[in-house]
Amino acid sequence: MIIDTPEVQDINSFSRFESLQEIYGIVWMLVPILTLVVGITIGVLVIVWLEREISAGIQQRIGPEYAGPFGILQALADGTKLLLKENLLPSRGDSPLFSIGPSMAVISILLSYSVIPFSYRLVLADLNVGVFLWIAISSIAPIGLLMSGYGSNNKYSFLGGLRAAAQSISYEIPLTLCVLSISLLSNSSSTVDIIEAQSKYGFWGWNLWRQPIGFLIFLISSLAECERLPFDLPEAEEELVAGYQTEYSGIKFAFFYITSYFNLLVSSLFVTILYLGGWNMSIPYIDFLPLFEINNVGGIFRTTTELFITLAKTFFFLFISITTRWTLPRLRMDQLLNLGWKFLLPISLGNLLLTTSSQLLSL
Protein backbone atom coordinates (compact mmCIF):
# COMPACT_ATOMS: atom_id res chain seq x y z
CA MET A 1 0.00 0.00 0.00
CA ILE A 2 1.45 3.39 -1.07
CA ILE A 3 0.62 6.36 1.13
CA ASP A 4 0.44 9.60 -0.85
CA THR A 5 -0.59 12.36 1.53
CA PRO A 6 0.09 16.10 1.17
CA GLU A 7 2.74 15.82 3.92
CA VAL A 8 4.64 13.11 2.01
CA GLN A 9 4.42 15.17 -1.19
CA ASP A 10 5.86 18.18 0.65
CA ILE A 11 8.76 16.07 1.96
CA ASN A 12 9.50 14.73 -1.54
CA SER A 13 9.38 18.24 -3.02
CA PHE A 14 11.74 19.49 -0.31
CA SER A 15 14.17 16.61 -0.99
CA ARG A 16 14.15 17.38 -4.72
CA PHE A 17 14.74 21.06 -3.94
CA GLU A 18 17.75 20.18 -1.75
CA SER A 19 19.16 17.95 -4.51
CA LEU A 20 18.80 20.79 -7.03
CA GLN A 21 20.54 23.14 -4.60
CA GLU A 22 23.45 20.71 -4.22
CA ILE A 23 23.79 20.35 -8.00
CA TYR A 24 23.63 24.12 -8.40
CA GLY A 25 26.32 24.55 -5.73
CA ILE A 26 28.62 22.06 -7.46
CA VAL A 27 28.13 23.75 -10.85
CA TRP A 28 28.68 27.20 -9.31
CA MET A 29 31.90 25.91 -7.73
CA LEU A 30 33.18 24.45 -11.02
CA VAL A 31 32.46 27.57 -13.12
CA PRO A 32 35.27 29.77 -11.68
CA ILE A 33 37.72 26.85 -11.80
CA LEU A 34 36.98 26.16 -15.47
CA THR A 35 37.10 29.89 -16.24
CA LEU A 36 40.52 30.13 -14.60
CA VAL A 37 41.85 27.12 -16.54
CA VAL A 38 40.56 28.50 -19.85
CA GLY A 39 42.01 31.94 -19.11
CA ILE A 40 45.40 30.48 -18.19
CA THR A 41 45.44 28.35 -21.34
CA ILE A 42 44.70 31.38 -23.51
CA GLY A 43 47.45 33.28 -21.69
CA VAL A 44 49.93 30.49 -22.39
CA LEU A 45 49.01 30.52 -26.10
CA VAL A 46 49.72 34.26 -26.17
CA ILE A 47 53.05 33.76 -24.37
CA VAL A 48 54.16 31.09 -26.87
CA TRP A 49 53.32 33.42 -29.76
CA LEU A 50 55.14 36.33 -28.09
CA GLU A 51 58.23 34.20 -27.47
CA ARG A 52 58.37 33.12 -31.09
CA GLU A 53 57.99 36.68 -32.32
CA ILE A 54 60.55 38.10 -29.86
CA SER A 55 63.07 35.34 -30.59
CA ALA A 56 62.59 35.93 -34.32
CA GLY A 57 63.29 39.62 -33.83
CA ILE A 58 66.42 38.94 -31.74
CA GLN A 59 67.75 36.46 -34.31
CA GLN A 60 66.76 38.72 -37.26
CA ARG A 61 64.47 36.22 -38.94
CA ILE A 62 60.79 35.89 -39.79
CA GLY A 63 58.67 34.26 -37.12
CA PRO A 64 55.44 32.25 -37.54
CA GLU A 65 53.14 33.82 -40.11
CA TYR A 66 51.00 31.10 -41.73
CA ALA A 67 48.79 29.78 -38.89
CA GLY A 68 46.30 32.59 -38.46
CA PRO A 69 46.93 36.34 -38.75
CA PHE A 70 50.55 37.11 -37.81
CA GLY A 71 50.96 33.43 -36.86
CA ILE A 72 48.92 33.87 -33.67
CA LEU A 73 47.40 30.37 -33.99
CA GLN A 74 50.76 28.61 -34.34
CA ALA A 75 50.77 27.32 -30.74
CA LEU A 76 47.24 25.97 -31.20
CA ALA A 77 48.34 24.20 -34.39
CA ASP A 78 51.34 22.67 -32.57
CA GLY A 79 49.10 21.46 -29.75
CA THR A 80 46.68 19.87 -32.20
CA LYS A 81 49.56 18.13 -33.95
CA LEU A 82 50.89 16.70 -30.67
CA LEU A 83 47.39 15.60 -29.66
CA LEU A 84 47.05 13.54 -32.85
CA LYS A 85 50.48 11.91 -32.60
CA GLU A 86 51.01 8.37 -31.35
CA ASN A 87 51.66 7.98 -27.64
CA LEU A 88 54.74 5.73 -27.39
CA LEU A 89 55.92 3.81 -24.31
CA PRO A 90 59.52 2.64 -23.69
CA SER A 91 59.74 -1.14 -24.03
CA ARG A 92 61.62 -1.63 -20.73
CA GLY A 93 60.46 1.46 -18.91
CA ASP A 94 58.27 1.76 -15.84
CA SER A 95 54.88 2.48 -17.43
CA PRO A 96 53.07 3.79 -14.29
CA LEU A 97 55.85 6.25 -13.44
CA PHE A 98 56.24 7.17 -17.11
CA SER A 99 52.54 8.07 -17.31
CA ILE A 100 52.09 9.71 -13.89
CA GLY A 101 55.14 12.01 -14.13
CA PRO A 102 53.81 14.51 -16.73
CA SER A 103 50.38 14.67 -15.06
CA MET A 104 51.91 15.35 -11.65
CA ALA A 105 54.03 18.16 -13.07
CA VAL A 106 51.21 19.98 -14.86
CA ILE A 107 48.60 19.55 -12.09
CA SER A 108 50.94 20.87 -9.37
CA ILE A 109 51.60 24.04 -11.37
CA LEU A 110 47.90 24.50 -12.19
CA LEU A 111 46.99 24.34 -8.49
CA SER A 112 49.36 27.26 -7.84
CA TYR A 113 46.98 29.60 -9.69
CA SER A 114 44.29 29.06 -7.05
CA VAL A 115 45.92 31.58 -4.67
CA ILE A 116 46.77 34.24 -7.28
CA PRO A 117 44.61 37.42 -7.08
CA PHE A 118 44.22 38.85 -10.59
CA SER A 119 42.17 41.67 -9.06
CA TYR A 120 40.58 42.39 -5.68
CA ARG A 121 37.61 40.17 -6.55
CA LEU A 122 39.25 37.72 -8.96
CA VAL A 123 40.90 35.21 -6.65
CA LEU A 124 39.90 31.59 -6.34
CA ALA A 125 41.11 31.07 -2.75
CA ASP A 126 42.29 33.89 -0.48
CA LEU A 127 44.18 31.84 2.10
CA ASN A 128 46.19 33.04 5.09
CA VAL A 129 49.15 30.97 3.88
CA GLY A 130 48.72 31.64 0.17
CA VAL A 131 52.35 32.29 -0.81
CA PHE A 132 53.67 29.32 1.13
CA LEU A 133 50.97 27.09 -0.34
CA TRP A 134 52.31 28.10 -3.77
CA ILE A 135 55.86 27.15 -2.75
CA ALA A 136 54.69 23.83 -1.29
CA ILE A 137 52.62 22.90 -4.35
CA SER A 138 55.22 23.98 -6.92
CA SER A 139 57.88 21.85 -5.21
CA ILE A 140 55.89 18.74 -6.23
CA ALA A 141 56.61 19.30 -9.93
CA PRO A 142 60.31 18.22 -9.79
CA ILE A 143 59.18 14.92 -8.25
CA GLY A 144 57.09 14.33 -11.37
CA LEU A 145 60.10 15.15 -13.56
CA LEU A 146 62.28 12.73 -11.60
CA MET A 147 59.63 10.01 -11.94
CA SER A 148 59.47 10.66 -15.68
CA GLY A 149 63.24 10.38 -16.04
CA TYR A 150 63.41 7.18 -14.01
CA GLY A 151 60.40 5.59 -15.73
CA SER A 152 61.86 6.21 -19.20
CA ASN A 153 64.68 3.65 -18.71
CA ASN A 154 67.05 6.04 -20.48
CA LYS A 155 70.29 7.34 -19.02
CA TYR A 156 69.82 10.79 -20.54
CA SER A 157 66.28 11.03 -19.21
CA PHE A 158 67.36 9.90 -15.74
CA LEU A 159 70.21 12.41 -15.66
CA GLY A 160 67.76 15.12 -16.69
CA GLY A 161 65.41 14.15 -13.86
CA LEU A 162 68.26 14.20 -11.34
CA ARG A 163 69.34 17.61 -12.57
CA ALA A 164 65.78 18.92 -12.25
CA ALA A 165 65.57 17.71 -8.63
CA ALA A 166 69.00 19.14 -7.72
CA GLN A 167 68.21 22.47 -9.36
CA SER A 168 64.84 22.74 -7.64
CA ILE A 169 66.32 22.06 -4.20
CA SER A 170 69.15 24.55 -4.79
CA TYR A 171 66.90 27.47 -5.74
CA GLU A 172 63.76 26.69 -3.73
CA ILE A 173 65.46 27.71 -0.47
CA PRO A 174 66.58 31.23 -1.54
CA LEU A 175 63.17 31.80 -3.13
CA THR A 176 61.40 30.77 0.10
CA LEU A 177 63.62 33.08 2.18
CA CYS A 178 62.72 36.00 -0.11
CA VAL A 179 59.01 35.22 0.26
CA LEU A 180 59.44 35.02 4.04
CA SER A 181 61.01 38.50 4.03
CA ILE A 182 57.99 39.87 2.15
CA SER A 183 55.63 38.18 4.64
CA LEU A 184 57.46 39.85 7.52
CA LEU A 185 57.15 43.27 5.87
CA SER A 186 53.45 42.77 5.15
CA ASN A 187 52.63 41.01 8.45
CA SER A 188 50.74 38.40 6.43
CA SER A 189 51.22 35.43 4.11
CA SER A 190 48.01 36.10 2.18
CA THR A 191 48.57 37.25 -1.40
CA VAL A 192 45.69 39.75 -1.12
CA ASP A 193 47.08 41.24 2.11
CA ILE A 194 50.56 41.55 0.59
CA ILE A 195 49.13 43.58 -2.31
CA GLU A 196 47.04 45.74 0.03
CA ALA A 197 50.16 46.49 2.12
CA GLN A 198 51.78 48.03 -0.99
CA SER A 199 48.81 50.20 -1.99
CA LYS A 200 49.20 53.21 0.32
CA TYR A 201 51.96 55.20 -1.41
CA GLY A 202 51.55 54.12 -5.03
CA PHE A 203 54.68 52.82 -6.70
CA TRP A 204 56.79 54.20 -3.82
CA GLY A 205 55.11 51.62 -1.61
CA TRP A 206 56.16 48.67 -3.75
CA ASN A 207 58.27 46.04 -2.02
CA LEU A 208 60.69 46.45 -4.93
CA TRP A 209 62.15 49.55 -3.22
CA ARG A 210 62.16 48.02 0.27
CA GLN A 211 63.55 44.66 -0.87
CA PRO A 212 65.81 45.30 -3.91
CA ILE A 213 68.20 42.46 -3.01
CA GLY A 214 65.32 40.07 -2.40
CA PHE A 215 63.77 41.11 -5.71
CA LEU A 216 66.91 40.20 -7.68
CA ILE A 217 67.29 36.88 -5.84
CA PHE A 218 63.61 36.06 -6.36
CA LEU A 219 63.85 36.87 -10.07
CA ILE A 220 66.93 34.67 -10.58
CA SER A 221 65.50 31.82 -8.48
CA SER A 222 62.16 31.90 -10.28
CA LEU A 223 63.92 31.67 -13.66
CA ALA A 224 65.89 28.68 -12.36
CA GLU A 225 62.68 27.07 -11.07
CA CYS A 226 61.17 27.47 -14.55
CA GLU A 227 64.26 25.79 -16.06
CA ARG A 228 64.70 28.58 -18.57
CA LEU A 229 67.97 29.58 -20.18
CA PRO A 230 70.55 30.09 -18.77
CA PHE A 231 69.24 27.52 -16.25
CA ASP A 232 67.87 24.80 -18.57
CA LEU A 233 70.39 22.13 -17.52
CA PRO A 234 67.73 19.38 -17.05
CA GLU A 235 66.97 19.43 -20.79
CA ALA A 236 70.24 20.60 -22.32
CA GLU A 237 70.09 19.43 -25.95
CA GLU A 238 73.85 19.24 -26.48
CA GLU A 239 74.35 17.01 -23.42
CA LEU A 240 71.12 15.09 -22.73
CA VAL A 241 69.24 15.06 -26.09
CA ALA A 242 66.10 16.47 -24.41
CA GLY A 243 66.60 15.40 -20.79
CA TYR A 244 63.60 13.83 -19.07
CA GLN A 245 61.49 14.54 -22.20
CA THR A 246 63.61 12.34 -24.51
CA GLU A 247 61.29 9.31 -24.62
CA TYR A 248 58.01 11.23 -24.67
CA SER A 249 55.70 11.91 -27.60
CA GLY A 250 52.14 13.02 -28.23
CA ILE A 251 50.02 14.49 -25.46
CA LYS A 252 52.49 13.57 -22.69
CA PHE A 253 55.22 15.60 -24.37
CA ALA A 254 52.69 18.44 -24.72
CA PHE A 255 52.16 18.28 -20.93
CA PHE A 256 55.83 19.10 -20.34
CA TYR A 257 55.66 21.87 -22.92
CA ILE A 258 52.58 23.37 -21.23
CA THR A 259 54.07 22.96 -17.74
CA SER A 260 57.08 25.08 -18.70
CA TYR A 261 54.89 27.99 -19.76
CA PHE A 262 52.42 27.56 -16.89
CA ASN A 263 55.37 27.83 -14.51
CA LEU A 264 56.77 30.86 -16.33
CA LEU A 265 53.42 32.66 -16.12
CA VAL A 266 52.86 31.88 -12.44
CA SER A 267 56.40 33.05 -11.56
CA SER A 268 55.85 36.36 -13.37
CA LEU A 269 52.50 36.79 -11.62
CA PHE A 270 54.14 36.29 -8.22
CA VAL A 271 56.84 38.85 -9.08
CA THR A 272 53.97 41.28 -9.74
CA ILE A 273 52.14 40.34 -6.54
CA LEU A 274 55.10 40.33 -4.18
CA TYR A 275 57.13 43.27 -5.50
CA LEU A 276 55.06 45.46 -7.88
CA GLY A 277 51.83 46.04 -6.00
CA GLY A 278 49.65 43.63 -7.94
CA TRP A 279 46.49 45.24 -9.32
CA ASN A 280 47.10 48.74 -7.84
CA MET A 281 47.23 51.75 -10.18
CA SER A 282 50.52 52.79 -8.52
CA ILE A 283 49.69 56.52 -8.53
CA PRO A 284 50.84 57.95 -5.15
CA TYR A 285 48.03 59.01 -2.77
CA ILE A 286 45.40 58.60 -5.51
CA ASP A 287 43.07 55.61 -5.75
CA PHE A 288 40.07 56.47 -7.91
CA LEU A 289 39.06 52.89 -8.76
CA PRO A 290 36.67 52.57 -5.74
CA LEU A 291 34.66 55.47 -7.23
CA PHE A 292 33.50 53.14 -10.01
CA GLU A 293 31.71 50.83 -7.55
CA ILE A 294 28.51 52.88 -7.63
CA ASN A 295 26.71 50.10 -9.50
CA ASN A 296 27.40 46.70 -11.02
CA VAL A 297 28.71 48.19 -14.27
CA GLY A 298 31.22 50.25 -12.31
CA GLY A 299 32.30 47.18 -10.36
CA ILE A 300 32.88 45.26 -13.60
CA PHE A 301 34.90 48.19 -14.97
CA ARG A 302 37.05 48.27 -11.83
CA THR A 303 37.68 44.52 -11.94
CA THR A 304 38.58 44.69 -15.64
CA THR A 305 40.96 47.60 -15.02
CA GLU A 306 42.69 45.80 -12.15
CA LEU A 307 43.02 42.66 -14.28
CA PHE A 308 44.58 44.70 -17.09
CA ILE A 309 47.08 46.33 -14.68
CA THR A 310 48.10 42.95 -13.24
CA LEU A 311 48.61 41.42 -16.68
CA ALA A 312 50.53 44.47 -17.96
CA LYS A 313 53.06 44.18 -15.11
CA THR A 314 53.21 40.41 -15.56
CA PHE A 315 53.89 40.55 -19.29
CA PHE A 316 56.69 43.05 -18.68
CA PHE A 317 58.55 40.38 -16.71
CA LEU A 318 57.61 37.76 -19.26
CA PHE A 319 59.35 39.94 -21.83
CA ILE A 320 62.47 40.05 -19.61
CA SER A 321 62.41 36.25 -19.20
CA ILE A 322 62.01 35.64 -22.93
CA THR A 323 64.79 38.10 -23.79
CA THR A 324 67.07 36.46 -21.22
CA ARG A 325 66.50 33.05 -22.80
CA TRP A 326 67.60 34.19 -26.25
CA THR A 327 70.58 36.34 -25.20
CA LEU A 328 72.47 34.55 -22.40
CA PRO A 329 74.53 31.32 -22.69
CA ARG A 330 73.80 28.22 -20.62
CA LEU A 331 75.62 27.71 -17.31
CA ARG A 332 77.52 24.55 -16.42
CA MET A 333 76.03 22.33 -13.73
CA ASP A 334 78.73 23.21 -11.19
CA GLN A 335 78.24 26.93 -11.88
CA LEU A 336 74.49 26.58 -11.42
CA LEU A 337 74.81 24.80 -8.07
CA ASN A 338 77.54 27.18 -6.85
CA LEU A 339 75.36 30.17 -7.69
CA GLY A 340 72.48 28.74 -5.69
CA TRP A 341 74.32 27.44 -2.61
CA LYS A 342 77.33 29.78 -2.32
CA PHE A 343 75.82 33.10 -3.39
CA LEU A 344 72.02 33.28 -3.43
CA LEU A 345 71.44 31.28 -0.23
CA PRO A 346 73.79 33.33 2.05
CA ILE A 347 72.62 36.64 0.54
CA SER A 348 68.93 35.74 0.92
CA LEU A 349 69.55 34.60 4.50
CA GLY A 350 71.31 37.89 5.27
CA ASN A 351 68.43 39.78 3.67
CA LEU A 352 65.97 37.91 5.90
CA LEU A 353 68.01 38.74 9.01
CA LEU A 354 68.11 42.44 8.05
CA THR A 355 64.37 42.45 7.44
CA THR A 356 63.70 40.76 10.78
CA SER A 357 65.96 43.23 12.61
CA SER A 358 64.30 46.26 11.01
CA GLN A 359 60.84 44.93 11.89
CA LEU A 360 61.87 44.34 15.51
CA LEU A 361 63.38 47.84 15.80
CA SER A 362 60.21 49.41 14.40
CA LEU A 363 58.03 47.87 17.13
UniProtKB/Swiss-Prot annotation:
- Please cite one Gene Ontology biological process associated with this protein: aerobic respiration
What cellular-component terms does GO give this entry? chloroplast thylakoid membrane
Its Gene Ontology molecular function terms? NADH dehydrogenase activity; oxidoreductase activity, acting on NAD(P)H, quinone or similar compound as acceptor; quinone binding
Q: Where in the cell is it found?
A: Plastid, Chloroplast thylakoid membrane
Pfam families (alphabetical): NADHdh
Q: List the InterPro entries hit by this protein, alphabetically.
A: NADH_UbQ_OxRdtase_su1/FPO, NADH_UbQ_OxRdtase_su1_CS
So what EC number does this one have? Answer: 7.1.1.-
Q: Which reaction does it catalyse?
A: a plastoquinone + NADH + (n+1) H(+)(in) = a plastoquinol + NAD(+) + n H(+)(out); a plastoquinone + NADPH + (n+1) H(+)(in) = a plastoquinol + NADP(+) + n H(+)(out)
Tell me the membrane topology, using the record's own terms: Multi-pass membrane protein
What are the TM regions of this chain, as residue ranges? 30-50, 98-118, 129-149, 165-185, 253-273, 303-323, 336-356
Main location, first listed in the record: plastid
Keyword ATP-binding listed = no
Enzyme's top EC category: translocase
Keyword list (alphabetical) reads:
Chloroplast, Membrane, NAD, NADP, Plastid, Plastoquinone, Quinone, Thylakoid, Translocase, Transmembrane, Transmembrane helix
Provide the assembly information: NDH is composed of at least 16 different subunits, 5 of which are encoded in the nucleus.
Family membership noted in the UniProt record: Belongs to the complex I subunit 1 family.
Briefly, what is this protein's role? Answer: NDH shuttles electrons from NAD(P)H:plastoquinone, via FMN and iron-sulfur (Fe-S) centers, to quinones in the photosynthetic chain and possibly in a chloroplast respiratory chain. The immediate electron acceptor for the enzyme in this species is believed to be plastoquinone. Couples the redox reaction to proton translocation, and thus conserves the redox energy in a proton gradient.
Which NCBIfam families does the annotation name?
A: PRK06076.1-2
> What's the protein here called?
NAD(P)H-quinone oxidoreductase subunit 1, chloroplastic
Gene name for this UniProt entry = ndhA
